[in-house]
C-alpha cells in the first residue's frame, strides 16, 4: 500500500493523492502502474504509492553528500524518503537530466566526466548542445569544464578525467584546456589567467586558450589582477593561481585565496575562481 492507499499506481482510484503523499497535492496523478513511470501530470519529482522519483532530477555532483542524493535524491520538491535518483546514486557523478543509474548515463560511463549532451559516437566529440556535466562513455570532457581548482584532488582532476589531458596541479578553467597544465610555453604548476601567453609564458596576448600563466612576476603581492584583459596590474607570481575578481562580480568577489568560488552568495558560484552565475 502506498501513499495513495493503493498498490497499482496513482490513478484516479487513488483520489489524487492526499496530504500524506509528500506534499504533491491533487496534481499527483499520471504515474503509470508501479508508480515508476512519469505521466504528463506528474509532479517533479512525485512520490507515488511507493518511494520512487517519477521524473527528474537524478543526482548531481553538487548535491551529493549534502542530502541531495540518498535521503532526498536532489529533488525539486519535498519527497521525504522517496530518494534513489532513478536507480541509486553510488558516487554521484550524474546530471540534471535522466541518468539511468546516476553516474551511468548516455552510453555507459564509469567514473564520469563528459558533458550534458551532444557527444559524438565515441563519446569524445562535442555537439552544439554540449554543456556540463553528464557522463559520456569514458571520462573526458567534451566541452566544459576542464579542471577547476575546487575540483582538484576531489575526483575532478585525475580520476574524473575532467580535462583533455593530465591536469597536474589543476589550475584549469571553463574552456578547452589542451593539455591542462602545460601553459603553452612551460609555466610550472599552471594557473594564470584568461589572456594569452607568449612563448616565454610571461607576456600577454589575446589569442591564447586557458589556462595560461599570464604576466610577469615582477610585482606579485598576494595574487593580484583580474580575469580579463591582463593589463599591467595583472601580475601573477610563481604561485600561478587564477586571478582574483571577475567582471560583473563586484568588489565583494575578491579573495586572496583565489582557488575558491568568490561570490558573496555561495549559491551563485560555479567551481571556477570568481566566475559567477548572474
UniProtKB/Swiss-Prot annotation:
Sequence repeats lie at residues 42-45, 48-51, 130-133, 136-139, 142-145, 239-242, 258-261, 268-271. Transmembrane segments: none annotated. Keywords: Keratin, Repeat. GO terms for cellular component: cytosol; intermediate filament. The keyword Transport does not apply. Expressed in hair root but not in skin. Expressed also in lung, pancreas, ovary, testis. Residues 42-271 are annotated as: 8 X 4 AA repeats of C-C-X-P. It comes from the Eukaryota. Belongs to the KRTAP type 5 family. In the hair cortex, hair keratin intermediate filaments are embedded in an interfilamentous matrix, consisting of hair keratin-associated protein (KRTAP), which are essential for the formation of a rigid and resistant hair shaft through their extensive disulfide bond cross-linking with abundant cysteine residues of hair keratins. The matrix proteins include the high-sulfur and high-glycine-tyrosine keratins. Interacts with hair keratins. This is Keratin-associated protein 5-1. It comes from Homo sapiens. The lineage of its organism: Eukaryota, Metazoa, Chordata, Craniata, Vertebrata.
Amino acid at each position: 500500500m502506498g501513499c495513495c492507499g493503493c498498490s497499482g499506481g496513482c490513478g484516479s482510484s487513488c483520489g489524487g493523492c492526499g496530504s500524506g503523499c509528500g506534499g504533491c497535492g491533487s496534481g499527483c496523478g499520471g504515474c503509470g502502474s508501479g508508480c515508476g513511470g512519469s505521466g504528463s501530470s506528474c509532479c517533479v519529482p512525485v512520490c507515488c504509492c511507493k518511494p520512487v522519483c517519477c521524473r527528474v532530477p537524478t543526482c548531481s555532483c553538487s548535491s551529493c553528500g549534502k542530502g541531495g542524493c540518498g535521503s532526498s535524491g536532489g529533488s525539486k520538491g519535498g519527497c521525504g524518503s522517496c530518494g534513489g535518483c532513478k536507480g541509486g546514486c553510488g558516487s554521484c557523478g550524474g546530471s540534471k537530466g535522466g541518468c539511468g543509474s546516476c553516474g551511468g548515463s548516455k552510453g555507459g560511463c564509469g567514473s564520469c566526466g563528459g558533458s550534458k549532451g551532444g557527444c559524438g559516437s565515441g563519446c569524445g566529440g562535442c555537439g552544439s548542445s554540449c554543456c556540463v556535466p553528464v557522463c559520456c562513455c569514458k571520462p573526458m570532457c567534451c566541452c566544459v569544464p576542464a579542471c577547476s581548482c575546487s575540483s582538484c584532488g576531489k575526483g575532478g582532476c585525475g580520476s574524473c578525467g575532467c580535462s583533455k589531458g593530465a591536469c597536474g596541479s589543476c589550475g584549469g578553467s571553463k574552456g578547452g584546456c589542451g593539455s591542462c597544465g602545460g601553459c603553452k610555453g612551460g609555466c610550472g604548476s599552471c594557473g594564470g589567467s584568461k589572456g594569452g601567453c607568449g612563448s616565454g609564458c610571461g607576456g600577454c596576448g589575446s589569442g591564447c586558450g586557458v589556462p595560461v600563466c599570464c604576466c610577469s612576476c615582477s610585482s606579485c603581492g598576494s595574487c593580484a589582477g583580474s580575469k580579463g584583459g591582463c593589463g599591467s596590474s595583472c601580475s601573477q607570481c610563481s604561485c600561478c593561481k587564477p586571478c582574483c575578481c571577475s567582471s560583473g562580480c563586484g568588489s565583494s568577489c575578491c579573495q586572496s585565496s583565489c582557488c575558491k568560488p568568490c561570490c558573496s552568495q555561495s549559491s551563485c558560484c560555479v567551481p571556477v575562481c570568481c566566475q559567477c552565475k548572474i
